[in-house]
């Protein structure tokens, strides 16, 4: 028997439904740890709890699906009054917009936060990264660098890391680098780069452009060598030598950094099966040279030429020329008088090195795969530029860019007497004219490319870089 003042109150059904929904949501929430990546596969939790922090970077990476297919939506709140953010909004609710599978938000979370996911397609998987520093998932603006190919090989380079600080020499100790400059030790904590190469026909560009999606694709070919190389002033790079590729095939290449960041794609084409030149790279006196030159295959077991097996008949005259040029250059009062507010003798030496290497190592091209309007010239080794190359090897030469010569002319003191041919007086006989800068009216190309190469593997003239 109940006393009159002990009555049972029945809650309204609408309130019971709200309480039940709140309890269900609380039970299905996952807590996202900081500086960690959570991989989600179906069934997907609808809500995630974010911890309290002055600032967090929340990033999303879709791991399945295509860039044109259906994608989920992600809503985020850093307000303690909004328990279930979604399309209907609420206090401080933000939608994380996805672009090619990536999306991120950075802001304060002083009261914690909630991440909601809706409209998840079947079988969709994704990653959520939370960091109190920089964004974990990212599509970077950088890309791999294409060196060159043969019929079955390719030289590729990662984006630069560990940039070197090379201060300009100052008076009175104005010493220029030697012909063979000393190479510092490689960084002890290099970036964790992974190369992915696949035939373009496999359609990697139609996938979500994220590291977790691209990593599911098996890379084509064999990484015959992976090492570090100080290719240019931008810093150290990872150099990859790929072998086992198919002749006359279009390839797409990505570089993944630290498992979660991905570069923009680049494209390249292997040469035809009759291509007879060999790759050369890793020359300390010509560090940026990384392309095919008119040499027979290197002695086994080497797959390419480098400083250890390049014939001395080729390297010694080049090193001697660099030494003599440097000696002559230092007779100018580089450390006492400023001859230019823009460049120094060190800039002159570097520009001359680039030019000398470009003209000494003729770059082979394949007429079957070269881009239209490239600066091609049928040649015979030995050629007029470097008679040290062995004879009897006919090849098609990709002429040096005229700008490689004019850059040296601009950077160097006039007393050296360095001069370049001009477009109106047959410069195109020995240089690629009108590909980077505008040539004279009517010149082939007319500067329409505005560059010596592009991300699609087209190379119009040899810059020596």
Locate each region found by the language model.
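Extended, non-transmembrane interaction/recognition domains
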Residues: 114-318
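Non-catalytic, beta-strand-enriched accessory regions in extracellular/secretory proteins
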Residues: 27-108, 112-114, 125-129, 137-185
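Mature extracellular/luminal domains of secreted and GPI-anchored eukaryotic proteins, especially small
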Residues: 213-215, 219-223, 227-236, 260-465
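Solvent-exposed loop and beta-edge segments used for protein-protein assembly and interaction
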Residues: 52, 109, 245-247, 349-351
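Fungal secretory targeting signals
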Residues: 1-27
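Beta-strand-rich binding-surface signature
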Residues: 55-57, 73, 239, 250, ...
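Short, flexible beta-strand-to-coil junctions
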Residues: 59-67, 118-122, 256-259, 359-364
């Amino acid at each position: 028997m109940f006393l009159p003042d002990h009555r049972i109150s029945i809650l309204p059904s609408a309130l019971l439904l709200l309480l039940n929904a709140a309890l269900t949501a609380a039970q299905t929430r996952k807590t996202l740890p900081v500086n960690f990546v959570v991989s989600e596969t179906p069934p997907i939790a609808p809500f995630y709890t974010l911890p309290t922090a002055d600032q967090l970077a929340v990033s999303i990476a879709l791991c399945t699906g295509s860039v044109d297919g259906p994608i989920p939506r992600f809503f985020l709140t850093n307000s303690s009054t909004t328990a279930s953010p979604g399309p209907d909004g609420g206090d401080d609710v933000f939608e994380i917009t996805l672009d090619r599978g990536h999306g991120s938000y950075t802001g304060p979370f002083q009261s914690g936060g909630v991440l909601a996911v809706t409209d998840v397609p079947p079988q969709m998987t994704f990653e959520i990264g939370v960091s109190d520093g920089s964004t974990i998932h990212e599509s970077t603006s950088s890309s791999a660098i294409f060196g060159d190919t043969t019929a079955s090989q390719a030289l590729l380079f990662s984006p630069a890391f560990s940039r070197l600080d090379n201060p300009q020499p100052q008076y009175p100790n104005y010493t220029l680098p030697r012909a063979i400059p000393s190479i510092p030790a490689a960084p002890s904590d290099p970036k964790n780069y992974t190369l992915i190469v696949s035939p373009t026909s496999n359609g990697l560009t139609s996938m979500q452009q994220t590291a977790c999606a691209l990593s599911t694709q098996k890379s084509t070919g064999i990484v015959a060598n992976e090492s570090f190389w100080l290719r240019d002033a931008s810093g150290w790079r990872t150099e990859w030598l790929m072998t086992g590729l198919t002749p006359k095939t279009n390839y797409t290449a990505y570089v993944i950094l630290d498992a979660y960041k991905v570069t923009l794609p680049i494209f390249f084409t292997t040469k035809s099966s009759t291509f007879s030149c060999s790759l050369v790279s890793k020359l300390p006196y010509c560090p940026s040279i990384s392309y095919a030159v008119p040499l027979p295959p290197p002695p086994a077991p080497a797959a390419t030429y480098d400083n250890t097996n390049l014939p001395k008949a080729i390297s010694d005259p080049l090193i001697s020329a660099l030494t003599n040029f440097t000696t002559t250059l230092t007779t100018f009062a580089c450390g006492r008088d400023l001859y230019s507010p823009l460049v120094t003798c060190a800039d002159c030496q570097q520009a001359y090195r680039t030019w000398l290497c470009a003209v000494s190592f003729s770059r082979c091209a394949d007429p079957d795969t070269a881009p239209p309007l490239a600066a091609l010239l049928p040649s015979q080794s030995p050629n007029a530029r470097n008679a040290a190359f062995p004879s009897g090897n006919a090849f098609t030469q990709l002429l040096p860019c005229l700008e490689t010569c004019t850059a040296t002319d601009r950077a160097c003191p006039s007393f050296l007497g360095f001069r370049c041919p001009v477009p109106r007086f047959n410069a195109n006989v020995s240089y690629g004219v009108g590909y980077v800068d505008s040539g004279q009216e009517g010149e082939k190309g007319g500067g329409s490319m505005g560059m010596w190469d592009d991300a699609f593997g087209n190379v119009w003239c040899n810059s020596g870089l």
